[in-house]
């Protein structure tokens, strides 16, 4: 379970970075060269999703819970926005959903 969660976390970071760098280019006037590491990050994101031993749709559904938490961590650390009680509750619910799916994928 811990290995799966850590892999989902790294996967989420790759996805967020791969989307954030083009956002910097489009919204903040960063160099177009940032699109190269963005593309590499998104390619790594896709590859990481293939490392799980479950059906793709089930992996994507479970990954979503960790993605929500990682995005909120990004919101706090990178964007500097303080998390609300609603953010924390949403993250907890998302992680519970991920846990239920991951525990169940070995039993089907």
From Swiss-Prot:
Ranges per topology, Periplasmic: 1-5, 52-60, 106-108
Spans traversing the lipid bilayer: 6-26, 31-51, 61-81, 85-105
Residues in the Cytoplasmic compartment per record: 27-30, 82-84
Keywords: Cell inner membrane, Cell membrane, Membrane, Transmembrane, Transmembrane helix
One term under GO cellular component: plasma membrane
Pfam family, one: UPF0060
Localization per Swiss-Prot or TrEMBL: Cell inner membrane
Topological category with respect to the lipid bilayer: Multi-pass membrane protein
NCBIfam families the UniProt entry points to: PRK02237.1
Annotated HAMAP family: UPF0060 (MF_00010)
Family: Belongs to the UPF0060 family.
Official protein name in the record: UPF0060 membrane protein YnfA
């Amino acid at each position: 379970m811990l290995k799966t969660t850590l892999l989902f976390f790294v996967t989420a970071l790759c996805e967020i970075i791969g989307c954030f760098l083009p956002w910097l280019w489009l919204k903040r006037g960063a160099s177009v060269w940032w699109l190269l590491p963005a593309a590499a990050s998104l390619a790594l994101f896709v590859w990481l999703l293939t490392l799980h031993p479950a059906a793709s749709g089930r992996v994507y559904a479970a990954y979503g819970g960790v993605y929500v938490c990682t995005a909120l961590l990004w919101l706090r650390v990178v964007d500097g926005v303080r998390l609300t009680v609603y953010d924390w509750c949403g993250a907890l619910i998302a992680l519970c959903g991920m846990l239920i799916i991951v525990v169940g994928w070995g039993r089907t």
